[in-house]
């Protein structure tokens, strides 16, 4: 609606009003009614234009009423277990076991918790799930012999479903590139091997960490040779 149309409507409304003789009081009343009518028409026209062109509109909700669309994603990232009841184990090597790698849990900084067992030098998994499996060994030698030295470290699994020993993680290292010359000083060497990975395990699975040359193990310091699992 244009401005000329609004003015014409106001003039028609003034002509339609009955003319009264009463002096200034009647004129003021007519002026008030005319102004009031003009404001109503102008306000309605402005509101229509704003709604029509989308300047204003119905308020939209900033947040969805139903948060169930978000909750599954948040729940997916959380574990059904609390940190206090997750199976965990950390065993250390027995420094007094000559010629073999024997794991112990009754030592400082060693533990078995929430169902994990140490049986026949193997860790027994108490429940199905994802587990972090890790182990470290440290080899030490003096000089290099004429024969090539190969050091291996392997983590194996015997699953309850097929009862076959399968290597999960394995590494091979050779600390000596050449033989120590005759008459030369035999210098010491150190060779650490660390293994770690995440695997899906079943209840009752047995895990072992083994080496091929226990005679080269270094037990000089605690915390150098260990084996463990952590439920995720």
Curated annotation (Swiss-Prot):
The modification Phosphoserine is found at residue 2. One of its GO terms (biological process) is regulation of biological quality. It comes from Pan troglodytes. Homotrimer. Interacts with SPPL2B. Keywords: Cell membrane, Cytokine, Disulfide bond, Glycoprotein, Lipoprotein, Membrane, Myristate, Phosphoprotein, Secreted, Signal-anchor, Transmembrane, Transmembrane helix. InterPro entries: TNF (IPR006053), TNF_alpha (IPR002959), TNF_CS (IPR021184), TNF_dom (IPR006052), Tumour_necrosis_fac-like_dom (IPR008983). It is found in: Cell membrane. Residues 87-232 form the THD domain. Glycans are attached at residue 79. The gene is TNF. It is a single-pass type II membrane protein. Residues 58-232 are extracellular. A lipid is attached at residues 19-20 (N6-myristoyl lysine). This is Tumor necrosis factor. Belongs to the tumor necrosis factor family. SMART domains: TNF. The soluble form derives from the membrane form by proteolytic processing. The membrane-bound form is further proteolytically processed by SPPL2A or SPPL2B through regulated intramembrane proteolysis producing TNF intracellular domains (ICD1 and ICD2) released in the cytosol and TNF C-domain 1 and C-domain 2 secreted into the extracellular space. The membrane form, but not the soluble form, is phosphorylated on serine residues. Dephosphorylation of the membrane form occurs by binding to soluble TNFRSF1A/TNFR1.
